[in-house]
Amino acid sequence: MNLNNLENIRYNEIKEFSDKIKKEFTFSQKKQVMDIIEKLNKDSRKNVIKLGQALEKFLNKYEEELKRTNNMYNFDRRYGNNYLIAGVDEVGRGPLAGPIVAAAVVLDLNVEEMQRVFNIKDSKKLSEKKREELDIIIREKAISYNIALVDNKTIDERGISWSNNEVLKRAVEGLKVKPDLVLSDGYAVKNLNIRNEFIIKGDSKSISIASSSIIAKVYRDSMMKEYSKGLNMYGFNHNAGYGTEEHVQAIKKHGPSKIHRMSFLTNIL
């Protein structure tokens, strides 16, 4: 759109153009968008000026996200630019039902800035829709990824601590490439024959750990929704097996299902 005669362009057309910029924006267009913002801010119409202000706010937010993402990539790269680094994380340690799931992800940490995966953070801080969108992008861009699980019966037999370590180990060992380094969230993975560094609050610092957190979360939530189709009385589709009041009352009323962790129900039954 040619904005040289901006005063002659209807507001709705300008808004449609502004919305398109937000949807299709890439950082290479920054200067062009800044010029557009300047023109919008000089318009005599208040609603057009507000479009310019909104576009400027969008650009600032984009730059903040770019900086945050770059910091997460750089955090991993500091271990070695030419290293294959895997991030590994688990989800489902605390639920009363279902498996514990882990994912390991190896990203290309040396891709150009605009080829990086944006908006990645701790999976718990993302909406379900955003997690599912990022899950697809991460899988497409990863050099390798692997998902592993330990089911509820094994958790009962071996205990949650063993199961937690085992699922992380399986996730890493199932990768199609062998990483030079494994970054884990919070604590080290025992009996792993690969160099391992644990990062406190790693899912908010490391791009590799945060990516694995998202893949594990989306995979497990999907599993629990499938289980819910045959066990809808427990509400697995929205509680993911965690001990909500609704879930606890359903266990007391209907008894445990085949996917409940009996060792977690001693105070309920």
Swiss-Prot record:
Keywords: Cytoplasm, Endonuclease, Hydrolase, Manganese, Metal-binding, Nuclease. The keyword Nuclease applies. One of its GO terms (cellular component) is cytoplasm. Residues 83-269 form the RNase H type-2 domain. GO terms for molecular function: manganese ion binding; RNA binding; RNA-DNA hybrid ribonuclease activity. Transmembrane segments: none annotated. It is an enzyme of class 3 (hydrolase). Signal peptide: none annotated. GO terms for biological process: DNA replication, removal of RNA primer; mismatch repair. CDD domains: RNase_HII_bacteria_HII_like. Gene3D superfamilies: Ribonuclease H-like superfamily/Ribonuclease H (3.30.420.10). It is found in: Cytoplasm. Manganese or magnesium. Binds 1 divalent metal ion per monomer in the absence of substrate. May bind a second metal ion after substrate binding. Endonuclease that specifically degrades the RNA of RNA-DNA hybrids. This is Ribonuclease HII. It comes from Clostridium botulinum (strain ATCC 19397 / Type A). The lineage of its organism: Bacteria, Bacillati, Bacillota, Clostridia, Eubacteriales.
